Amino acid sequence: MHCSVSNHLRLLFVCAAFVMAMGTICTAAEKKDDTTDPRRNVVFIICDDLNDYIEGFSGHPQTVTPNMARLADSGVRFTQAHCNIPICGPSRACLFSGIYPHNSGCYGFTKWDTYEVLKNSRTLMDYFRQNNYYTLGTGKLLHHMVRGEWKNFGNRADYGPFAYDGKDNQPHPDTPAPYNEIGPVDGSFGPLVSLEGRTTTDGKPLMWRTGGWQSVDKLTIHPSGENDPTPDEKNGDWAVEQLQALAATKAKNRKPFFMGIGFIRPHTPLIVPQRFFDMFPVDEISLPEILEGDIDDTFAQTIRGLPEGKEPDSERTEDMGGKLFRKLVESYDSRDEALRHFIQAYLASIASVDEQVGRILDVIDSTELKDNTIIVLTSDHGWGMGEKDYLYKNSLWQESTRIPLIVRAPGIAQPEAVCDRPVSLVDIYPTLADCCELQGDTMKNERGHSLDGHSFRRLLTDPYGGTWDGPEEVLTALYKWRMKYNPHEESYSLRGNDWRYIRYENGKEELYNTVSDPNEWKNLATEAQYSHEINRLRQVLASRLPEKGIVPPQPQWKAPGKPEPKSNEYWKDLYFKKNPDADADKDGTLSWPELHAHKKANASPVQSTQ
């Protein structure tokens, strides 16, 4: 009996040991097979020319953006976010490089990757790719697209739909004159409706087209009223398809990803389907607060003039905002009527983009991506709506510099939170790198530049009382139509919690108390009681700029007493304007080999003297 019990106990012990050993082996095997990368994904959404006219930012009381509001409810709204230069090309170069214009030299529309500093520094997406992220994008992200910055890229930037007469883009046929004389981009707005039977003034039939500058793709309005996809809708389709495919891939087989989505609207032409216009009856549109004579104590007009070689009616005059405002008002019976029609088209365009944002959120929120994907929504700069007689971007006032910025970061950002600390686009790169714990140098070599921005991750965690290493004032530069830029001879704005300071290139200044004067109506720069504040801000600005300027992409030699020569790029661009067919690969830009080949192919044969 005793032996039997002992044998049973021995057997039980052996079995238990075997089970424990197998459990250990199985656990080890499970750990070995679990190769899921725990790093966060990023979906970065940027809209073009979007000011603060979205819900939660107090820009316009009638805006309808439920999906952007839904995103804000799950993250942090930055109510004092600003751009670093208020026009598309250089603003996006600053955003995606994390480098200020005064350190890169990129204040204008020369291709970003021709600047010595920028081409030797890693873009945001390249930095993610170097950290073994899958990078994919579509639409307008950088102003000059370089596919090599992405592993997978969808659609090029396309500003359509455009009315088209078989040869040239035309303004929307319902856009009144003289505003429509500005052209098919900035001088065009109206609903996307059937053009059957519509013609140009000289009788050419009109149709809708997309395809960017590379091709002509007919866009049809069907009898049902439905339209073929607009460029923004195509980008929404692409993003949804890619997200669905990523969500369907087992996590252990999927790299973390960085996805960029660039929507064109509300950039002009403000042409979107009729149903979005119907949301905003034109007679009911609320107008912004506009002070009569508000421009009288400002000095932007003292530096505006025509760029060299530009005609008074050029689309790219320095005073584009004043020109657009005057032409719009001349096209209607009153200023208020003019602004109502334009704002209706602007709000409709925003609503159309919001619909695409909703489609993207629906995919993320209905899959496992929801808990591990950071979402950022922002704009490259704002847009003035007639304040200070200005209808455009590229001013140093609030309407142009302020942008929406919403960040959802699961496990990091507080939901339904608001942060009023001044931050800017240059801070997004270091913030995402911080949140995703990226490693390595953002400079490719010593000719690059380190990040100028600062991570605001701590403000995501504590939006109300958090601290960060960033400056107290946002620095914004002004774009001008010129080939070379000296950082010490440009125009700048500093925007803090309580003050905006503007110094123009000619030394003129503006100072606004943004607490008591949020509309920036009263310039206090010349009032003695504010001399201490303006002196402080002068010193702050001086401390933020480099000691010496940046060498431009193509430095030009100038003989003493001789006019400054035009750059080679100027002549190449002029040749391209006159000979668009020289662009052999149809990528929207003209390379030097393409120019030489075109000139050779079209050279007149030499006449024999024999």
PLM regions: where:
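Bacterial N-terminal signal peptides that target proteins for export
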Residues: M1-V14
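Formylglycine-dependent sulfatase
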Residues: H2, A17-Y504, K508-E509, P518-Q539, ...
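Signature of WW domains and closely related Tyr/Trp-rich beta-sheet microdomains
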Residues: L511-Y512, D581-A582, L590
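Adenine-nucleotide cofactor-binding loop residues
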Residues: V515, N519, D585
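A contiguous, mid-protein "functional segment" used to position or interact
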Residues: S531-W557, G561-K562
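Primarily EF-hand calcium-binding motifs
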Residues: K572-D585
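Acidic Ca2+-chelating loop motifs
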Residues: D585-L595
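Short, composition-biased linear "edge" segments at structural boundaries
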Residues: K600-A601
